[in-house]
């Protein structure tokens, strides 16, 4: 189930069989859908649903389509989730190193009684059991994943970086230095947290930096932010976010495209491209 001809050519080069979604759905015992969330419903109805029968398994790596009912599977089909906690490039990299990303599994429907075994087998084949696998429900994974993306990892972090960059440059500081301080160095801090936790990170940075964390952090992100996060979680759990996103996607995603265009013109991206070019190796 590929996005482009280029993707198909890559699969052929890597000696995978390439076929239409409908043909794959007809032949496969396990149908693992890895398309964008907003496309699942239409592809399922047109090309997968007609080929489902008892004993087959539907699999996903994010529960959006099942939790928000863009896919409503028949009762005689197993439905599972196998979700690596990392992008595909990272999953492949650590697999080739002989380890694996951690992951999640979920059983949404289990008429065969074997759905959990299949989910664990797929997780093992992807190397996830070497990294550690947690069992959850599709709803838990979907709500928490959307919450983390919107409030911390993407929405929260990106806006925090942009505001920091804008504050320094508007005060007359060189944009290159502002980029280093507010964007580039974020990876260094996140890597420390990733490898040892927040307390370990604090033990590595300077006492001045740690004191500044406690001194100014609560002023920049006061307790009111947590209340706004609670409202965000309610919008996710109620289905409002999913409804708004699916309606946006059905119109061709004009607002999303406009935001992408605006971000591409933001000084933080223009300066960032120049900074990153300094680290390119010829």
Question: Where in this protein do the model-derived segments appear?
Answer:
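Glycine-rich, highly charged phosphate/nucleotide-binding loops
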Residues: 14-23, 86
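Small-residue-rich helix-loop
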Residues: 175-188, 196-197
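Interdomain hinge/lid region at the active-site interface
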Residues: 159, 163-166, 170-171, 196-256
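N-terminal charge/polar-biased segments
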Residues: 249-282
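Rossmann-fold dinucleotide-binding core
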Residues: 59-150
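Single conserved hydrophobic/aromatic residue that forms the stacking wall/gate
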Residues: 1-7, 12
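Small-residue helix-packing motif on alpha-helices
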Residues: 8, 24, 174-179
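Rossmann-fold NAD(P) dinucleotide-binding segment
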Residues: 20-71
